[in-house]
């Protein structure tokens, strides 16, 4: 089936030319292209048109789950007759296994899986396994993490036909091989039950139940029924049942894997003994032998993913299978907000390996644990057939990949201008901000506020709540489904103000937002770079009254570049509006539930009562030293002292396995050293 785009709109402004150029590039065989599209110019609509034109299975990669959910919703609206799927991490909570030698502390893996997202992941893989070409998968960086191989998955697909002669017990064994669990009492997703000649299967990737009925050894009927009412939804002459888990294997491969694990265990014990580390040798012996016994008895063990190389039949160092392996070779990858997504992909491997190094070196895991990992960037890049990098601020990598040729989309079909930017002094910035909030709340408009740290976001939210302002916050400690719900609540008026740190920048489609307030805009650094400021300001570009207020005591180079670029785009849009007699019109977008969520709150709890702030356990955060413009006036001695202090902080963070913080300290050191060299 081909892609069929459904929309009441036609491409306008820069969109027709952008769609034409990107489509021609793909049909010409260009590997890499860049779509430079400003906020509100309809990049998603352009992407949908290109997908429909080239008719290829497509992976859309987003750098966070919230934006992935938003893209998923929009693509489902554009392609209601095609398979639009969602593939992100299914953890509501995840504490990875770790060991800190400085305190001799071992941290057991702890997690909570979201069953709804797990269903969507399995649905995405099932759609690709089905062989249909009209598949769009919207994914986070989870698409580069290891999973079972496509061959093993296909071998465990169960194909049945009405009228087929098939012994029921053989069918039940095949269900078990596909990791379905028999439960005749409570039929949950991924279970099956047997009642006489009828087998009900609660498919892991669907909300419905497949009912297969036998007459002797012949399949008499195949029906899909509602999981609650058991009303028949449809009948089938043939059906494919896909595995209930993304990691499946055969009994034969399990036996081979166990033998290989035993061989590698002997080698690792010998290695530790030869090094004089008898404690490590004993530790690895006890842990792995226990895991092997569990595999023999139950077919699995805790942390079985660390043995995935053996079950996949991979060599040491060979990359794991990932979602991309399930796509046909002639596919299309669209990397949204590429200036953030590409560096994120690059960083995944290093962080994973650093954590596992201690586990392997101290005898908690075999070296094979290193091979349960995300792809290296080079491996991901080698899997790309054709790619479109999408960003309002593409980075040097994307420009180099496309050989400097970019498709520009800066005209908004709605006629909306880039928001005006006003710089105000930081003195009394909170009082000034509250005045602006109250003005817009009276007009039923929404406000975004960005701070520099998570703690500042929480404290500002609490302050606003204490002054009877409907406010909430989102940051990285807030789980995915909570973030999605709070954004919908902001749009629907449950909240007037949303406070955040780094999650309010790229891609959020919030036409109700008329004001973006950037606190401490002059604190030069990652969160206040030219790209970050441009992206943050863009959140107000979907509202006819859009405005940005930067609170700062000086205008940094990044601020000036953002202001200048905004003025250039405003002039271009004004010229277009005048030529086509367009009056800027407010974007109206329906508010709908992106993913099924429970009645949960994100930061605040509103139920006809006073809102209460939900606190997260956030460690003390420091602003980057180099964010302070005073470093330009520091003496040579002061710079050397700062480098020394920051190096100590970096080592301490690395020792505590806080690699993100350590990387930030490393970047500070490099900038301090660069400043020192100029003295």
Feature-to-residue mapping (PLM):
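Walker A/P-loop
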Residues: 28-50
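Pre-Walker A (Motif I) flank of P-loop NTPase domains
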Residues: 28-34, 56-57, 133-135, 445-446
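N-terminal cationic and glycine-rich segments that engage phosphates or anionic surfaces
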Residues: 34, 87-432, 436-442, 461, ...
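Conserved RecA-like helicase motor-core motifs
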Residues: 80-89, 303, 446-448, 460-482
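Conserved helicase motor "Helicase C" RecA-like lobe of SF1/SF2 P-loop NTPases
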Residues: 151, 453-475, 671, 675
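Conserved strand-helix element at the start of the C-terminal RecA-like helicase core
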Residues: 57-69, 86, 280, 440-462
């Amino acid at each position: 089936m081909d892609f069929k785009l459904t929309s009441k709109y036609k491409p306008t402004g820069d969109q027709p030319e952008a769609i034409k150029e990107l489509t021609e590039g793909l049909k010409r065989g260009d590997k890499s292209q860049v779509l430079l599209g400003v906020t509100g110019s309809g990049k998603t609509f352009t992407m949908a048109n290109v997908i429909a034109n080239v008719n290829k299975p497509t992976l859309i990669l987003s750098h966070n789950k919230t934006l992935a959910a938003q893209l998923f919703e929009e693509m489902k609206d554009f392609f209601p007759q095609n398979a639009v799927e969602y593939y992100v991490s299914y953890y509501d909570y995840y504490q990875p296994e770790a060991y800190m030698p400085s305190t001799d502390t071992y941290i057991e893996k702890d997690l909570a899986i979201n069953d709804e997202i797990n269903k969507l992941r399995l649905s995405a893989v099932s759609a690709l396994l089905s062989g249909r070409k009209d598949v769009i998968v919207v994914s986070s960086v989870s698409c580069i993490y290891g999973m079972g191989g496509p061959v093993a998955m296909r071998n465990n697909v169960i194909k049945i036909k009405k009228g087929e002669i098939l012994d029921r017990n053989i069918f039940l064994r095949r269900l078990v091989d596909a990791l379905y669990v028999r439960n005749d009492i409570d039929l949950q997703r991924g279970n099956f039950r047997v009642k006489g000649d009828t087998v009900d299967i609660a498919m892991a990737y669907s909300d419905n139940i497949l009912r297969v009925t036998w007459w002797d050894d012949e399949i008499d009927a195949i029906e899909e029924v509602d999981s609650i009412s058991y009303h028949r939804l449809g009948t089938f002459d043939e059906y494919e049942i896909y595995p209930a888990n993304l990691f499946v294997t055969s009994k034969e491969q399990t036996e081979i894997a166990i033998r290989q694990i035993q061989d590698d265990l002997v080698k690792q014990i010998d290695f530790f003994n030869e090094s004089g580390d008898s404690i490590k040798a004993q530790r690895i012996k006890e842990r792995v032998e226990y895991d092997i016994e569990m595999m023999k008895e139950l077919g699995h063990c805790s942390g079985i993913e660390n043995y995935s190389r053996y079950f996949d039949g991979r060599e040491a160092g060979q990359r794991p299978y990932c979602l991309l392996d399930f796509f046909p070779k002639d596919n299309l990858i669209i990397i949204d907000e590429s200036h953030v997504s590409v560096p994120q992909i690059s960083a995944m491997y290093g962080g994973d390996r650093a954590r596992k190094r201690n586990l392997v070196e101290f005898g908690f895991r075999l070296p094979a644990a290193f091979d349960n990992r995300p792809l290296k960037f080079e491996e991901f890049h080698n899997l790309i057939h054709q790619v479109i990098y999408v960003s309002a601020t593409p980075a040097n990598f994307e420009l180099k990949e496309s050989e400097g040729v970019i498709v520009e989309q800066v005209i908004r079909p709605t006629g909306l201008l880039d928001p005006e930017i006003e710089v105000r002094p930081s003195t009394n910035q909170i009082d000034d901000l509250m005045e602006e909030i109250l003005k817009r709340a009276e007009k039923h408009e929404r406000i975004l506020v960005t701070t520099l740290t998570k703690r500042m976001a929480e404290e500002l939210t609490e302050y606003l709540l204490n002054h009877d302002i409907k406010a909430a916050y989102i940051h990285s400690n807030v789980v995915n489904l909570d973030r999605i719900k709070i954004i919908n609540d902001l749009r629907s008026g449950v909240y007037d103000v949303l406070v955040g740190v780094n999650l309010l920048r790229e891609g959020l489609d919030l036409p109700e937002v008329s004001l973006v307030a950037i606190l401490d805009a002059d604190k030069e650094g990652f969160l206040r770079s030219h790209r970050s400021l441009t992206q943050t300001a863009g959140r107000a570009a979907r509202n006819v009254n859009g405005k940005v207020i930067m609170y700062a005591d000086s205008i940094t180079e990044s601020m000036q570049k953002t202001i200048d670029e905004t003025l250039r785009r405003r002039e271009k849009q004004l010229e277009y509006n005048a030529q086509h007699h367009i009056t800027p019109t407010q974007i109206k977008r329906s508010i709908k539930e992106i993913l099924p969520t429970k009645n949960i709150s994100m930061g605040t709890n509103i139920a006809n009562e006073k809102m209460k702030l939900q606190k997260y356990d956030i460690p003390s955060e420091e602003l980057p030293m180099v964010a302070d413009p005073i470093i330009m006036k520091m003496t040579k001695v002061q710079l050397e002292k700062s480098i020394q202090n920051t190096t100590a902080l970096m080592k301490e963070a690395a020792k505590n396995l806080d690699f993100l913080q350590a990387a930030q300290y490393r970047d500070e050191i490099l900038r301090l050293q660069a400043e020192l060299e100029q003295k």
